[in-house]
From Swiss-Prot:
Protein name in the entry: Large ribosomal subunit protein bL19
Organism encoding this protein: Methylobacillus flagellatus (strain ATCC 51484 / DSM 6875 / VKM B-1610 / KT)
GO molecular function, one term: structural constituent of ribosome
GO BP term (any one): translation
Keywords assigned: Ribonucleoprotein, Ribosomal protein
Gene it is expressed from: rplS
Length: 129
């Protein structure tokens, strides 16, 4: 029974055809959200740090936290929601936890996340001697 549900969810994800970049907790992302104001429809950018990811197939979601006017604001996004226009990873964060809820109590410099450095491929040494 569970396999049938899992298969249906995978088919639905494939049908949606959304390209979601790989991101992890600690990454700074910009989420483009479709907002309807009266008759106008526009895309609103929401930039912040991913503090949690919930992997549940079609019901997957993630929480983005940002500081707006000195106040912490968190927003939960459904990963496969039609309201999400785009997800762009701005910066990779180097963290050792999967849930960064401790950032809620932090402010200022202690709430910063170290940037993950990309490992470079080792240089090839030519043995021309």
């Amino acid at each position: 029974m569970a396999d049938i549900i899992k298969q249906l969810e995978q088919e639905e994800i494939a049908r949606l055809g959304k390209t979601i970049p790989s991101f992890a907790p600690g990454d700074t992302v910009v989420v483009g959200v479709n907002v309807v104001e009266g008759t106008r429809k526009r895309v609103q950018a929401y930039e912040g740090v991913v503090i949690a990811i919930r992997n549940r197939g079609l019901n997957s979601s993630f929480i983005v936290r940002k500081i707006s006017s000195g106040e912490g604001v968190e927003r939960t996004f459904q990963t496969y929601s039609p309201l999400i226009a785009s997800i762009e990873v701005k910066r990779r964060g180097d963290v050792r936890r999967s849930k960064l809820y401790y950032l809620r109590e932090r402010s200022g410099k202690s709430a910063r996340i170290k940037e993950k450095l990309q490992l470079r491929a080792p240089k090839e040494t030519s043995s021309a001697e």
